[in-house]
């Protein structure tokens, strides 16, 4: 249960920055964001602690700065992250009802069996999230719990998100060294969807692609549930490094070029001269030589195609097809110009580019910089009706359905 009137914290562990947000909810359920802070990330790569000492110092610095602004001290904190090592597994459990009513005990049995199977399948994994996808009653799909419905057969489809226990131990260790306890972990993909997608988009089917600096994350949502997610350890920086390696340019020059590319590939006159060679102004430190437009654009296309092909395989495997009505969104965190147009051409569907300050009532820089934290705040404050492990979500929340309540305060 959420502690009202006490300051609570959310921290996002990113590759470039660590972000902390401290908030408070009073007895009237009114939210107050007390402070935020951003510090440079160290000792963390793609959500994984790779250097305990550096990560601890960076985390401590970020939390301390936020605590100082909020004039409060945190004992626990919610951690937002995304790792390529996250595993997303879909389970379907079945039970014979034999013409009787479906009771809560029947659903509880299926939930327990699924959770038990996940833990037995890989003892080295820890469960981060469980989502209810849907129920199948005598061949018919039910979105909500089919309590008191007469049936012969009940199936329950669930999605489990897990992470390696050793990764979790290292995260806990870093925060313990900061004298703070991890309250819960929240997938960054889930948090971004909670912040940026509306109820209809989450209900009827959406695909969210978040292209980051060192990784690309994919989340597929339907019936208000995360039905599939995966993170690939390849991102925008790989385009920069490809240009650098193949064209013998330094990384600074390659980044400037990457940022200037029009990914609709219709107009790149800013980069190239009338003979279609890279303009000399982009050779900041390297010696000028002829580098053709086709070479640079082919390098960028090849890396993008590699990323999108991996994503396409995942989408096809789940059956959530953007050409058949599912919404497809790409996050603008990478800031590649006209990336959504190339994405639309690749997937054969209209792709919408999301800005992290998409809401019209945006709080400006707060929404832009802290979209993941604000999404996590929404999940923590209101609960998520299809999520099964919000043990620390306010039990008075109206959005906390039976599926969530079942796991509340259970091991």
List PLM regions with ranges.
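Nucleotide/phosphate-binding catalytic cleft detector across ATP-hydrolyzing
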Residues: 1-17, 21-76, 80-207, 225-227, ...
